[in-house]
Structure formats: C-alpha cells, structure tokens
C-alpha cells in the first residue's frame, strides 16, 4: 500500500489540492462497523437510512440500483462520506475503548484498513503496527497473495464470492515445504435479480451478468507458485 499511497498523493497534488501527509484506505465494512460502534445513522437524499447493518450493501450495490445517473451516485457518496465522518468523529468519545480497539484490529487483520504516511519514521511505525498494508516477508510464516481486478466496467464485483482452502504442509527432501491451495470463485447473481438490473451494473452487451476478472497470485517470500491447474473458463497466464 505504500506505493499506492505515494501515487494517490501525487494525483491529489497534481490536481491542485496540495500535498498531503498521508493516505487512509478503508472499505465499506469498516465504515459500517464504525457507524455501529458510534450509533451513527446517515439518511441519503433518497431517504435510505444507513447504519451499522445496511451501509455496506447500499454503497456497493443499492446506490447503483436506485440512481442510474452517475452524478446522483457521486452526490450520494459525498453526502454519506461527510455525514458519516461527522457522526463517527463526533461520537467517538462515547465509544468503549476496548470495543474500538477490537474493531480496528480485526479490520486491519482482514486487510480492510491500510494507511500510508509520507514521513519515513511514521511509515515505519505503521508497518510495525500492521497498518501499512505490506506483504509479509517472513519466510517462517509464508503468505500467498491472491488479488483480483475487473476486466470491464460495471458493478458486478458485489456478486463475486470466493473461498480459499490451504492444505497441510508437506515437507520435501530438500527441507522446503509444499502447500496445496485451492481458490474457488463463484457468481452469486441469480437470473431473477439479473432481469431487474441495469447495464451499468451488469456490464450489458455480451457480458450481461457475467464476471470477467484478472487474478493475481503473489508467491510467499522465499517461495514460488507452481503446478497451477484451473477449471471453468480461463484465458491464460503470464509470469512477472
């Protein structure tokens, strides 16, 4: 995430907003958890009430169902972001510290929060506390990265489900350890709902309701990925 933060900072500055000290990224689940902790509720221009239960689904999917005009979507996002920030920070003093710490820790562990600081010393501290969004370099506790990104427009990633199964390690004659890993992706959109969605969500055309995406596999530190097999439609692979 350090590189992402650097690029985002440069984009912000290049667009005339000035230099920033850092960049914070969090997903809609974190926002929903913070609203729940602080008892904050946000009402959208269309009358939807976002709270500790409904926020993530609305921001990832509901807003696109309700508003077909991107300008309306952007206005809703801006209002929600402003109201949520004011509500959360305005009520943060009333929150149980232990619950707040637990929520932040679990969100960081799940990769839902990442922070970048332009100051090298501050960035090093973030890395020590697990906030920097770095890839593990610990060869004794190997981590394999699995990342996805969409090939086309639309908002179909809301319907993407994934499951990862890591087998028990098998020690090889050279002392290395091999792990079998199975990654399963599935499309959770059913035909009944598909008929109610706009092309803006489903991609439209020949891709209507289907999921097309890139999968990036990052080998663990000191290790490698081998013997890849696939099922379903697969368009090939490159190694970097």
Task: Enumerate the predicted regions with their spans.
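Lumenal/extracellular ectodomains and adaptor appendage modules
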Residues: 1-6, 39-240
């Amino acid at each position: 995430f350090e590189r992402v933060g650097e690029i985002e900072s440069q984009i912000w500055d290049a667009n005339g907003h000035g230099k920033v000290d850092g960049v914070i990224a969090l997903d809609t689940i974190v926002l929903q958890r913070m609203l729940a902790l602080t008892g904050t509720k946000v009402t959208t221009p269309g009358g939807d009430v976002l709270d500790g239960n409904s926020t993530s689904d609305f921001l990832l999917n509901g807003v696109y169902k309700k508003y077909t005009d991107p300008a309306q979507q952007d206005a809703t996002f801006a209002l929600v972001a402003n109201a949520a920030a004011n509500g959360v920070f305005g009520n943060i003093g009333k929150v149980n510290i232990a619950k707040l710490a637990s929520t932040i820790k679990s969100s960081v562990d799940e990769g839902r929060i990442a922070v970048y600081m332009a100051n090298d010393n501050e960035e090093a501290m973030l890395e020590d506390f697990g906030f920097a969004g770095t890839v593990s370099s610990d060869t004794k506790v190997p981590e394999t990265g699995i990342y996805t990104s969409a090939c086309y427009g639309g908002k179909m990633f809301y319907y993407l489900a994934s499951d990862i199964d890591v087998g028990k390690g098998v020690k090889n004659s050279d002392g290395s350890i091999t792990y079998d890993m199975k990654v399963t992706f599935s499309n959770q959109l059913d035909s009944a709902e598909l008929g109610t969605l706009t092309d803006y969500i489903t991609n439209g055309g020949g891709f209507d309701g289907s999921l097309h995406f890139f999968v990036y596999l990052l080998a663990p530190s000191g290790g490698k990925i081998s013997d890849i097999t696939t099922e379903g439609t697969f368009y090939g692979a490159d190694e970097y």
